[in-house]
Amino acid sequence: MNGNVVMKAKDTVFAALAECFVTIGTRRYNFMQAINLEAKFEKNKTEVPILGKTGKGNKASGWKGTGSATFHYNTSIFRQMMLQYNETVEDIYFEIQISNEDPTSGAGRQTMILMDCNIDGGVLAKFDADGEYLDEDMDFTFEDFKMPEAFKDLEGFLTN
């Protein structure tokens, strides 16, 4: 494989070098409590029968956005959302902005903004007499997203 271009180890993005902001209404929070977050885009597909073929085709027919996060149990902003829903039946939608940037990587910076996020539920109260620290998990959905900053193509990635 002489001449094969390979990725440089330094171009990986260090996992902890990220920023996360949550915007609820007019308030923007530096969500430094986050331990991890993952947002997924899943296309809905419809099977399409095609005359003259033994197999079926697949046509995209929409999408859904889902996510999950784990964060330190030291903020009440999501419990306040649940309390407001319980008291008023008004559901709260919010934005999450995630940026990944490792200054030692040639990939640069990527920023994703998840819009119209909505929590599925959450922890109201918690303790662990045998634990070291408290954290909590949260699942959520989102209805739109944008990417104002994209990673750069690494050297050798684009071949034509």
Predicted regions and their residues:
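Intrinsically disordered, low-complexity terminal/linker regions enriched in Pro/Ser/Gly
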Residues: 1-5, 149-160
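Surface-exposed flexible segments
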Residues: 33-36, 87, 106-121, 158
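Solvent-exposed edge beta-strands and adjacent loop segments
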Residues: 2-79, 116-139, 146-147
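Short, surface-exposed polybasic-and-hydrophobic patches located at secondary-structure transitions
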Residues: 141-144, 159-160
